[in-house]
Structures are given as C-alpha cells and as structure tokens.
C-alpha cells in the first residue's frame, strides 16, 4: 500500500476537473438551471413543518406519526443518495432529475390522499425522500463539479446552495397561503404540479456523453467507495454532517409547533421559516466564497460552534416574536452554509468522477441525523410534553461537530498508475 505521504500531494495538472477536450456546459447555464431546480425542490420541502398541525388535527394522528414520516423521508433521501448519485455520474443528470421530478409530484399527490399512518409514511416519507435524492444537491453539484473549473467550484456550489435558500424564503409564505386558501390537501396537489416543472428545467443540464464519464483516469465505483471510506477525513466529514442534519431538520419541522405551544401566532412561525431561508441565501453564498479562500475545515467548525451558541442564547432569553426572528436570522446564516464547503472538500480530495455518488454518501450521514432529529423531536415531545431535551441534544452535537471537523485534511489524493503501485 502506498504511504500516506506519497498518496497526498499538492494539486497538479487539473486532476479534479474534466480534460479540456471534454465537451462542457457553460457555467452560466449550469448555475441558472441548477439554481432553479434546487429552488423548487428545496423550497417545497422546507415548508413541510407547516402541515404538521393541520394534518394531525384533521386525521387525528399524534405528532410522532407525522414526525416518523418526515424522519423516513430524510432517511430515504439519504439512503437513495449514493445510488442516484452513481446513476447521475454514469448516465448524466437529466435522466435522474426527470425521474425525481415525477416521483416528487406523485409523492405529494399521495401524501394528500393518505388516510392511514402507514400510507402517509409511504408517500410523504419513502416516495418524496427518494424523489429528493434525485432533485437536490448531490445531482446538481455533480454537474457543477464536472463543468466548473476548480478555481471557482466552491463559489459555484455556494451559488446553488443560495438558490435553495431563496426557494425556502420564497416557498414558505406561498405554502402557508395555499393551505389557508385551498386547504392542506389541495395545497399539496398544487405543489405536486409545481414539482413537475423540474423536468423541463433539467433539459438545461443534459450533459454531453463524454462529460459524464471522463473526469480523470477511470476509477471503478467500488474502488472509489473503498478509497473514500478508508480516508479518516471522509469519516470525520460524515460525522459532522450527521450533526448538521439533526439540527436543521429538527428545527425546520418542530419549531412551528414549539412556538405554537408557547402561545405565539402561526404567522410568527411562518415568518421565522421564511427568515431562515432569506438569511441562508447570504450564508450559503458567503460560505461558498470563503471556502474558495480559507481552509474549509475551519469554516465548518466555526459554523457548528456558532449554531450551538445561537441555540443556547435562544433557550435562555424570553420567547417573543422578536427573539424568534433574531434567532431565525442567525440560524439562517448558518443553516445550509455547511453544504458548499462540505461538497467542495469531497471534490477537492477525491476528484469529480464520482462526485455525485460520494456526495450522496456524505449526505446519507446528514440524513441519518435528520431522521433522528425529526423523529426524536416528536417522540420526546409525546412522552415528556416538551422539546427541551432535544434542543440541548442539538447543542451538544454542535460542539462535537466543531471538534471533529478541525483535523480534516483537504489535500487532494493523487493516484499512482497501477504499474507504479505494483513495482512497490
């Protein structure tokens, strides 16, 4: 086995980008289409917490029933991510995005029609989770990695993440208005029609045949997986991303009900979720830009530590609309700001040939955290009548994520030719 000091070398000769002869999409086309897709996909899902109260009241379900479906959704998203990423790396992003768009629409329709907890888990959980794996960051970032130069890659990923954040800001008040105007069932059906728009937009990300497979000297899928999971930095990156998922999905799904339990108007929760999306536009763009200039591990550690600090302050000040809005703004800056530097580290260290798949594995860890955050929130609320324990778990995990990101190494791997390895 080649020593670590020989495998880790400075980036030389563009190993992380497609060869110059490979057909490439223009950066503006990739960013506009990718941003529009992420805006729709992430915008729709960000408002799911608004459905908790009307669905559970109308169906007579507990919060744990709704929370479990959302937990399954996040877990299914994560589990399907490596597979959809592998398909996108092999066959190009368009086919995966089109399939994800149709599945998203079907899941929203069946979510509206589900009358049992099992059916709701299958539609809102399993179907929509798989759909999200094919319409969000892993697939879009794979296209960015293959068609944007390394010198601007982190920035471009920040732009795409900022678009997803804008979708959250845009769609939350829209979804709240749809529920108030048409009822929760019809609102879900209208969102299903909106999800179908992803397919025509995805035509702009249809990649030339060679671009999807010629990133560098060919490496098999199994070899790429073994290499990544054998790297300590990849393991630490996954551990930190687990915490990200736990924190943001717990807050996104349960904060509206937390605020309602404390006597605040529903409009406060809607405003808070919208503010998270608005300020996350700034946060994700800034994180992508800073990741181009500073060590990404320090950026990630700082984000996780600041999240824990923000939660501690929020829990220890009087709960008023103003304190909620300030907390939402601060958390918004930190919300998905982990996404660009995390994916940029994967691309920087392992190259872009299997970027969607490896990004999918990292995101799987995120979604396991999401599963636990959203489910545990409902479970502990039903058993204790309070979210307090889960809030403090989120604080402790943030401190842990701060620590595990510090030793991550960002130096690209350079793979020696097979003949050179055999001679050692």
Mark where each language-model region is:
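Extracytoplasmic gate region of multi-pass secondary transporters
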Residues: 48-52, 231-285
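Hydrophobic core of transmembrane alpha-helices in multi-pass small-molecule transporters
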Residues: 39, 107, 119-135, 242, ...
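Helix-to-loop junctions at the C-terminal end of transmembrane segments
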Residues: 80-92, 284-295, 382
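C-terminal transmembrane helical hairpin of 12-TM major facilitator-type secondary transporters
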Residues: 276-280, 286, 293-345
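Residue-level signature of mid-helix packing/kink "hotspots" within the transmembrane helices
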Residues: 46, 74-82, 168-169, 277-285, ...
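Conserved MFS/SLC helix-loop-helix module at the cytosolic interface between two early adjacent transmembrane helices
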Residues: 79-118
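Cytoplasmic helix-loop-helix junction between adjacent transmembrane helices
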Residues: 124-162, 351
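Helix-loop-helix hairpin linking two adjacent transmembrane segments in secondary transporters
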Residues: 160-210
